[in-house]
Amino acid sequence: MPLTDPSEPPPRSAALRRWLGNFWPAPLGIDRREHLRMACGAALGVLLSALLARWWANVWGIEAPWMVASVGASAVLVFGLPSSPLAQPWPVLAGSTLSALVGALCALLVPDAAWSGALAVGLALALMVQLRCLHPPGGALALFVVLNHGGGVHLAVFP
């Protein structure tokens, strides 16, 4: 004989646990070797980018951030989702470069950072879509350039 009546609703804790369980992500079908490849690839890609950007900044005597966070976001896309259209060479390179240039232009033309930042992200998105080089970290890069007060166009060459 069951201890609970089937016509009674389940206890609140069980209902809450089931509801919260709906937010838990589905398991990934990626084995440990692929996890390791992704993590090592991203780490090595960021390291190589950082070393190259720092060397380039020293060669040209540029005093600016030699790497920004959007490089890490790009590495997640390139090494974590390599078959994604957003992680292909054209979107990564053109989307980032275009966004940095748009950010520098907006910072130059619009003095208020709130307006300039919003305009930079919106214009960068519109241009990336038009040129088929949509890369989400590009939006972050456009905003970073504005918040860095233009940061110079050199950020477009090595973000």
Q: Which residues make up each language-model segment?
A:
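Acidic, glycine-rich active-site loops and adjacent beta-strand->loop/helix elements
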Residues: 81, 123-125, 147
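Membrane-helix interface "capping/anchor" motifs
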Residues: 81-91, 128-139
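Hydrophobic core segments of transmembrane alpha-helices in multi-pass, intramembrane catalytic enzymes
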Residues: 95, 120, 141-145
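Active-site beta-strand/loop microenvironment that shapes enzyme catalytic pockets
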Residues: 101-102, 130, 142-145
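Internal alpha-helical transmembrane segments of multi-pass membrane proteins
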Residues: 110-136
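C-terminal binding/interaction regions
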Residues: 139-159
